[in-house]
């Protein structure tokens, strides 16, 4: 519907921010380019996004914030936001199942009482804001949320209501990379025959450093980033 600008055609500060994201994730999320046709709005959009999503409080974690996005975006039928933020939710909650459950039916998802109360209020703000009153907000205070936390719940719901509609307006589809993010731990690259021969020809210190580094990083992703749900290869294949 709308032409998507190329990286070469957008202002340098936008290009620099997009490069930072690509360096961290390995790809450029499509929404970054879809919205770049309006640079001033792009800057305001992502500044507001970061202010809401990159902070954390005792009662409202980064993972909770992403679940708000997934639940409200599902209610608003926004494919891009459900898939993209579902991927981030899997990583930030360290729970590969929860984002799919929340996207499909958050009311039946494996949530604790605090998370369920947060999503109940967030969805009300997103789809029927006229029903939100002091009694509704009081349910969040009962779960330890401060007034600032409650403001964030409302702001995230409102901000992504706009984001959902912009994604639909621009027909922005999720990147393929989002679908596997947070589902499987990162593993060392598989060396092909020619690469193995090159490795064997290297001096032994280089070979030792390489293999040791791959072993350490693989263990890190399995035990630190995804503890408990993928203890061994057999567990992944049987699930």
List where the protein language model places each region.
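Hydrophobic alpha-helical segments
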Residues: 1-239
């Amino acid at each position: 519907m709308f032409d998507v600008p190329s990286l070469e055609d957008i202002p340098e500060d936008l290009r620099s921010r997009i490069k930072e994201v690509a360096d961290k994730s390995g790809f450029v999320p499509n929404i970054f380019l879809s919205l770049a046709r309006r640079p001033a709005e792009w800057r305001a959009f992502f500044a507001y996004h970061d202010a809401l999503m990159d902070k954390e409080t005792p009662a409202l974690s980064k993972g909770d914030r992403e679940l708000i996005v997934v639940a409200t975006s599902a209610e608003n039928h926004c494919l891009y936001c459900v898939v993209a933020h579902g991927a981030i939710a899997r990583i930030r909650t360290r729970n590969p199942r929860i984002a799919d459950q929340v996207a499909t039916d958050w009311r039946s998802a494996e949530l604790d009482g605090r998370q369920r109360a947060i999503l109940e209020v967030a969805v009300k703000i997103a789809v029927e804001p006229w029903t939100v009153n002091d009694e509704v907000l009081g349910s969040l205070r009962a779960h330890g949320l401060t007034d600032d936390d409650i403001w964030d719940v409302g702001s995230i719901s409102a901000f992504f209501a706009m984001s959902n509609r912009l994604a639909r307006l621009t027909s922005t589809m999720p990147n393929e990379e989002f679908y596997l993010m947070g589902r499987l731990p990162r593993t060392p690259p598989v060396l092909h025959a020619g690469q193995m021969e090159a490795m064997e020809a290297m001096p032994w210190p280089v070979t030792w450093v390489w293999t040791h580094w791959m072993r350490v990083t693989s263990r890190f992703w399995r035990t630190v980033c995804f503890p408990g749900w993928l203890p061994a290869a057999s567990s992944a294949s049987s699930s």
